[in-house]
Amino acid sequence: MTNNQFSEDTKKIADQIKDALMGISDDLVLESKEVEEIFEELSQNEEFEYEMERMLSILNEQTMDLTQLQSRIILLIRKYLGKTKNLKLKMLKMDEKLINKNVAEVSNYLMHQHSKIVRDANKNLTNPKDKLQGLTKQARIDLKRLLKSFAVYQIYMFMNPKRIAGETKLMNFAYNMIKGGMKLAKKYEGGKEQEIKSYSPRLIKKLKKAHVGFKKSGGISI
């Protein structure tokens, strides 16, 4: 499988998770269409793309300086918010205390996914040099996607600070549900019976549909 195909597949799953999370609640501060417009604006921002490339230098092949990474992403988001053309986003009041709390929670999710990527990249490699090469060529693309995903989530967090607290579990549940169905999702964080009952039927339906699509596409690990 080429790096291009790997990158496209991981992006597809990331988009499926994002789409599924849109169905969590009907009381979003911003409507789904507006959220999509902001995501689109971000993806076309060349300066943002350049800054994300610079952030990759914070990562070495096997470890992550989370504090430094976190600080840079927050600074980038603040900088981006100051330049956005979206008037509704400009008018939102930020709950700094709650945002700081949520940053820590989302960071735990980031580290969890980073560990998965490193572990998968190291699979079946025994020579340390091979591991380093594997991470550089295979995992670096996915780490970049992960960083972008985290940064986009920060923007979403600024838009919806009061709704983020429980969503790291939802993100983990969505990831596992799409990748391995309900059976896999129940084994990890966010998959307890009571937690599943608290999720909207619409979300569960979207995740099941995404899982079927994932299997049909040949389902690779992300």
Curated annotation (Swiss-Prot):
Q: Which UniProt keywords apply?
A: Coiled coil
Name this polypeptide is given: Uncharacterized protein RC0039
| Pfam families, per database record | DUF5394 (PF17372)
Look up and give the organism this protein is from.
Answer: Rickettsia conorii (strain ATCC VR-613 / Malish 7)
Listed InterPro entries: Uncharacterised_RC0039
The coiled-coil regions, if any, are 43-73
